Amino acid sequence: MAEQYDAIIIGAGIIGASVGLELARRGWRTLNVDRLPAAGYGSTSASCAIIRSHYSTLDGTALAFEGYQYWRHWSEHLGVADERGLARFEEVGCAVMKTSSNGYLKSICENLDTLGILWEDWDNETLKKRLPIYDLRSFAPAKLPDNPGFGEATGPAIAGAAFMPQAGYISDPQLATHNVQVAAEAAGAKFRFNTNVTKIRQVDNAVRGITLA
């Protein structure tokens, strides 16, 4: 028997589940379909779950910084409790080294300044004090372990770093996705797992539905 939805989202990782949540909150009848057994079991679970705002484009930086606000206020964003608990945002900051290959972060720091995002300019003395285990020598370009010169310094010290305090990581990306699923279901969204999509049906170049295995 065919089921009718306003939107069908293929995938229930952190992106797919979030799409379902936001559409459901706007009154759409949504269905997330995933071939895996639970939300966030695919590439989301393999994610290092870094939350950062330093990107090469202004639009990307602005979008990331908006997302950072949701992670900071995760409980308020979800609006519901999850019996498994909530994922934590560990706001430890992020240091990025300045090198010739990344333009010494000039354009990235300009984007941060334009949007009023906090960052600190660390010289090598500060970097060594804050991260004493760090080797400040340059090893670029990257080499494979069996290449000649692997692990050998190739140049002088790096040129310091930019430190962004409004950054960190999520304690458990799969749990975070389950949190989103619970919030989406509270808003009326539906999820189907262990389900393979075999066809995306189209009529007159418009998607009309999906066929399941």
What function would you assign to each model-found segment?
Residues A2-I15, L31:
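Beta1/beta-strand and adjacent pyrophosphate-binding region of the FAD-binding site
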Residues G20, A24, A183:
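Gly/Ala-rich phosphate-binding loop of Rossmann-like dinucleotide-binding domains
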Residues A24-T44:
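Glycine-rich FAD pyrophosphate-binding loop
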Residues C48-P148:
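Dinucleotide-binding Rossmann-like beta1-alpha1 core, especially the glycine-rich loop
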Residues S101-F193, K199-A206, T211:
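Flavin (FAD/FMN) cofactor-binding and adjacent substrate-gating region
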